């Protein structure tokens, strides 16, 4: 873990390619974002897709065509400030570089989407144990049977993240995450996974499998920022760039600034 | 049902003993209250009990010793303004009169506690079906294994009301009822009834049994204003007066005035 509390300092290290790992826990009072960079011909459709699907795709940053800075989110150069990237061509990964200087061009537009880390800290601060954090694993994520609202060429299934919680913590987690509509907000489901098309809760499509459920634990499901990656895989644009899973953009925005109340 | 929207008009009818039935649906934008009237020697302990148990016993009105009015809640004479009362001696019901003029005395203090009707209307307005209202039955209520915080001679088990909801509505109902901490607030439990000591969900201790659960429905449990009646039954004060179940005090306070946000 990159143990730096200040987001500007953390980005400096990442910018120099001195840290190339996952960003969970780094500058943890600050918003981290999912990244998606697209050629201009796709930009309006993708913006529209985010607008129609605010729970999985909460847009917290929107660059100007050809401009690698994101002034709203801090002194950011998107070409260098993420630990690792993925370069996609027609839905396939062709490279996983540590900067994208050689891929950047004047036609690209940057999108930054909120991520659940922003409400996990308030959950932990409320005394709610988060299994995947305690085990230092990646949150289990599942492709559901729920269709996103399509926009232009972008369509696909909703991906959800899952946290096993007892009933009391499930209720409290609904209250707390409701305060953060800009980072997925309240859960979209709890209880029976098959109701949203999840066949095997122990076998997630993304992330690590959960531990066996305790008797009093129920699965609680939040819309997940991996949804756009899954949609990009399906929709197969000629070209796009995302962050590598878990290796997010660290911004200067406080998590608490995203709280609706 | 007493189909009057204005709480002052509704109380006038009740005051004249022209309506003696349950008050559900009457003046439904206004707060209705559970009633508890106690001799002064118990008043401080009961006030303390309410303070220690705000979820089941949210105190919304607190009279002055010997004074039957409740100016905070409207132009109320507590001796006449409830459709039917119960007179208790040592935990046993000895009378169920339509007014308490002959029982009132200078030593009595009135307590009014919030009730779940105040958040049921916002639930219905959010499109959430409430089974017991749709079936025109009384909400099922259960004595749990959860101890209230004792205060002086008052102690006993928490009573909960239960509404069967699908997962989506359960999540939404947690958000909506969280806005109303003064009337029980968020649920205290959902899912497995045995975790809170309920042996048979189809066999409630108070109110009417629920209908058979649909496949996608889970039981959602709120702290219930019947708790103080159950506690009074156990704690057996020499004398007390309550409302008869379902026949509540209608106040001039808007439900929306109780919303925390």
Swiss-Prot record, chains A, B:
EC number: 4.2.1.-
Gene3D superfamilies found in the cross-reference section: PSTPO5379-like, PSTPO5379-like domain
Keywords of this entry: Lyase
SUPFAM superfamilies xrefs: PSTPO5379-like
Class of enzymatic activity (EC top level): lyase
MF annotations from Gene Ontology: lyase activity
Domain of life of the source: Bacteria
Protein family: Belongs to the D-glutamate cyclase family.
Record protein name field: Putative hydro-lyase SAR11_0660
Phylogenetic classification of the source organism: Bacteria, Pseudomonadati, Pseudomonadota, Alphaproteobacteria, Candidatus Pelagibacterales
């Amino acid at each position: 873990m990159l143990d730096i509390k200040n987001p500007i300092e953390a980005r400096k290290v990442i910018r120099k390619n001195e840290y190339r790992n996952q960003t969970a826990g780094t500058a943890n009072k600050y918003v981290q974002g999912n990244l998606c960079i697209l050629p201009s011909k796709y930009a309006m459709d993708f913006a529209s897709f985010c607008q129609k699907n605010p729970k999985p795709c909460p847009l917290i940053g929107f660059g100007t065509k050809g401009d690698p800075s994101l002034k709203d989110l801090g002194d950011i150069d998107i070409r260098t400030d993420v630990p690792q990237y993925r370069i996609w061509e027609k839905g396939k990964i062709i490279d996983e570089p540590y900067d994208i200087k050689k891929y950047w061009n004047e036609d690209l537009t940057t999108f930054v989407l909120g991520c659940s880390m922003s409400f996990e800290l308030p959950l932990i601060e409320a005394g709610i144990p988060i299994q995947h954090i305690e085990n230092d694993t990646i949150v289990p994520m599942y492709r559901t049977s729920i269709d996103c609202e399509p926009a232009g060429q972008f369509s696909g299934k909703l991906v959800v993240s899952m946290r096993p919680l007892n009933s009391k913590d499930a209720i409290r987690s609904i209250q707390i995450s409701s305060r953060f509509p800009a980072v997925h907000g309240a859960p979209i489901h709890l209880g029976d996974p098959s109701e949203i098309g999840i066949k095997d809760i122990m076998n997630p499509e993304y992330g690590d499998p959960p531990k066996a459920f305790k008797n009093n634990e129920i699965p609680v499901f939040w819309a997940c920022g991996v949804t756009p990656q899954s949609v990009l895989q399906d929709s197969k644009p000629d070209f796009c760039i995302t962050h590598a899973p878990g290796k997010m953009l660290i911004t200067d925005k406080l998590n608490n600034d995203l709280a609706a109340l």
